[in-house]
Amino acid sequence: FEKFGCVIGDECHGFKSKSLTTIMNKCREAEYRFGTTGTLDGTQTHELVLQGLFGKIYNVTTTKKLQDNDTLAKLNINVLLLRYPESVRKEFGKREYHDELDFIVKHEGRNKLIKNLALDLKGNTLVLFQYVEKHGKPLFELIRDGAVKERKIFYVSGQVEASDREVIRQIVETQKNSIIVASLGTFSTGINIRNLHNIIFASPSKSQVRVLQSIGRSLRKSDDGSDATLYDIADDLHWKSRENFTLTHSAERIKIYAKEQFNYDIHEIKL
């Protein structure tokens, strides 16, 4: 790598990985280093690592400024705070994070709500999930089986070839009312869909990079110039002073929305 005099790193927030850090450190003669990203994770450690690899961070603009000058689509966020029954919250107890996620992604009422929401929305909709086997596939089947025959429903995970994902992306850009059920790993970063009107966060996350990158999928201006809408599913399983993990994570996401100056409303829904 010593023969290279210039390095350009796209989506450079990912350059904190060991493999990319190793490559960068071997580019000893690379006097010119350019890294571009729309998202940092908000921690000082992350910023210091990237500064060590590329140099001083320069903030060119913000999402809010790009929305104000009509470069990006306007975004409306609806936080759907799911209130589980008192009996469920009381019996839920103090569980480990993974046990809580298992409970949430397998909850029949929650998945039915996501299905109905996806089917009721107008425009192209992206439903993002985290777990393939226990959430993504069952959710896709629920939505597919509930949709009218003419509506196009797509499923994307790491098991789907990259070439097929690109075909799906191109098809959706020609549609007006399709649904993509996709894993966060495949559709949260680097995928641009011109006519994407809605995003549903079906899985909880507190990662600033993942949240903002996922939102970025919907900010490209659509042909009809309509606003983008994000539906953030939050889960309230707290009991008295005991808060559940995913409720805390939803509070972290709301802090991100406020920091980015996004418009958001919180709606309580009883399951």
Language-model segments: which ranges?
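Conserved RecA-like helicase motor-core motifs
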Residues: L126, F140, R144-E166
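Conserved RecA-like P-loop NTPase helicase motor core
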Residues: T39, G158-K259
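Charged phosphate-binding loop/patch that engages nucleotide di/tri-phosphates or the phosphate backbone
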Residues: I254-K255, K259-L271
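A short beta-strand-to-loop transition that corresponds to the Sensor-1 phosphate-sensing loop
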Residues: E11, T36-L40, Q130-V132, A182-G185
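Residue-level preference for the first positions of well-ordered beta-strands
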Residues: C6, N124-L126, S178-I179, N198
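Conserved interdomain hinge at the start of the Helicase C-terminal
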Residues: R89-Q130, K134-D145
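Short, conserved loop/helix-junction motifs that constitute active-site signature segments
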Residues: F1-F4, M24-A30, R194, K221-G225
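Post-DEXD/H (motif II) to motif III coupling segment of the RecA-like Helicase ATP-binding lobe
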Residues: G5-N78, Y257
